[in-house]
UniProtKB/Swiss-Prot annotation:
GO biological process: translation
Protein name as catalogued: Small ribosomal subunit protein uS14c
Subunit field text: Part of the 30S ribosomal subunit.
Alphabetized Gene3D superfamilies for the sequence: 1.10.287.1480
Organism placement in taxonomy: Eukaryota, Viridiplantae, Streptophyta, Embryophyta, Tracheophyta
Main location per the UniProt record: plastid
Key words, A-Z: Chloroplast, Plastid, Ribonucleoprotein, Ribosomal protein, RNA-binding, rRNA-binding
PANTHER family named in the record: 30S RIBOSOMAL PROTEIN S14, SMALL RIBOSOMAL SUBUNIT PROTEIN US14M
Gene Ontology terms: cellular component: chloroplast; small ribosomal subunit
Highest rank taxon of the organism: Eukaryota
Stated role: Binds 16S rRNA, required for the assembly of 30S particles.
Gene of this entry: rps14
Pfam families: Ribosomal_S14
UniProt keyword annotation of Acyltransferase present: no
Family note: Belongs to the universal ribosomal protein uS14 family.
Length: 100
């Protein structure tokens, strides 16, 4: 189980990302349309003034149950340990153990 502070930090980053998403898209669109260097400079300063944690690259996927940051499956949002346990307990519909 990951530390609760790490899980809370990740949730806070997710909220900030959603809050500033439209502003960030608008500024990036204006940046690509701008032709003057001074105008691009002003827009880039506005982009840099946004909170650092609102950038989508600062997010990490975490397991929904344990908070583990490594070995996550995007389709389920679970780490490999939890995925295996839940699949063996038949808690994931449509997931079967392969055999050949």
């Amino acid at each position: 189980m990951a530390k609760k502070s790490l899980i809370q930090r990740e949730k806070k980053r997710q909220e900030l990302k959603q809050k500033y998403h439209s502003i960030r898209l608008y500024l990036k669109k204006r940046m690509s349309e701008a032709s003057l260097l001074d105008e691009k400079w002003e827009i880039s300063e506005k982009l840099q003034s946004l909170p650092r944690n609102s950038a989508p690259t600062r997010l990490h996927r975490r397991c929904l149950l344990t908070g583990r940051s490594r070995a996550n499956y995007r389709d389920f949002g679970l780490s490999r340990h939890v995925l295996r346990e839940m699949a063996h307990a038949c808690l994931l519909p449509g997931v079967i153990k392969s055999s050949w």
